[in-house]
């Protein structure tokens, strides 16, 4: 499979989870947009990724509806692990016409931050940090060199930004600003945009 355009990064820390992605939207060497948001809050969770932009948007809408349905039907909140497993099942259901996206999914349950990585066919991996997309090789190098479980949420945010900026310098399908989604240990979600 070819590398999917764009770059997204996720980091799990003791204080929370951080997801980040670049804004450039490109296909086949052509830049379609410089303002494509690829990190979204869903209920108490965050989702982000790289690949086909429409597929990532569709997955976000599908997950939003399924999480609401689960919580209404069961009269209790869905856990991060269960929501990630639900996303895995949805991706696998479409294996013959897959969503061409690599997805990062994060949340906090009872003060425990969690980060999951999913491929287009629904493989589900629990990880402490991850990078997906065409700029992942550069971003993961920065993460591996500087990640520590002792990082604060602010330091993790800075590491996310540094890894995405490094990928934007070396990958033509990455760039044009960064979206950051932070979920703190107490469940508060913060989103922000940083220009290039």
Curated annotation (Swiss-Prot):
InterPro entries for the chain: Ntn_hydrolases_N, Pept_T1A_Psome_bsu_arc, Pept_T1A_subB, Proteasome_sua/b, Proteasome_suB-type
Propeptide part(s) removed at maturation, as residue ranges:
1-6
Q: What biological processes does GO assign it?
A: proteasomal protein catabolic process
* Compartment(s): Cytoplasm
Give the reaction(s) catalysed. Answer: Cleavage of peptide bonds with very broad specificity
Spell out the subunit comment. The 20S proteasome core is composed of 14 alpha and 14 beta subunits that assemble into four stacked heptameric rings, resulting in a barrel-shaped structure. The two inner rings, each composed of seven catalytic beta subunits, are sandwiched by two outer rings, each composed of seven alpha subunits. The catalytic chamber with the active sites is on the inside of the barrel. Has a gated structure, the ends of the cylinder being occluded by the N-termini of the alpha-subunits. Is capped at one or both ends by the proteasome regulatory ATPase, PAN.
What protein name is recorded for this chain?
Proteasome subunit beta 2
């Amino acid at each position: 499979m070819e590398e999917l355009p764009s770059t997204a990064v996720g980091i799990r820390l003791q204080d929370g989870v951080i997801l980040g992605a670049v804004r450039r939207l490109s296909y086949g060497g052509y830049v379609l947009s410089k303002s494509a948001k690829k990190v979204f809050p869903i209920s108490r969770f965050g989702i982000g990724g790289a690949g086909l932009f429409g597929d990532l948007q569709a997955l976000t809408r599908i997950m939003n509806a399924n999480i609401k349905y689960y919580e209404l039907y069961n009269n209790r909140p869905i856990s991060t692990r269960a929501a990630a497993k639900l996303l895995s099942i949805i991706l696998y259901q479409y294996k013959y016409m897959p969503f061409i996206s690599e997805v990062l999914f994060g949340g906090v349950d009872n003060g425990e931050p969690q980060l999951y990585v999913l491929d287009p066919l629904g493989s589900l991996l629990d990880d402490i940090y991850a990078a997906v997309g065409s700029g992942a090789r550069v971003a993961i190098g920065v993460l591996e060199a500087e990640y520590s479980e002792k990082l604060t949420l602010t330091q993790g945010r800075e590491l996310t930004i540094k890894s995405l900026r490094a990928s934007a310098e070396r990958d033509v399908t990455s760039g044009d600003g960064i979206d950051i989604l932070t979920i703190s240990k107490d469940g508060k979600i913060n989103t922000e945009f940083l220009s290039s």
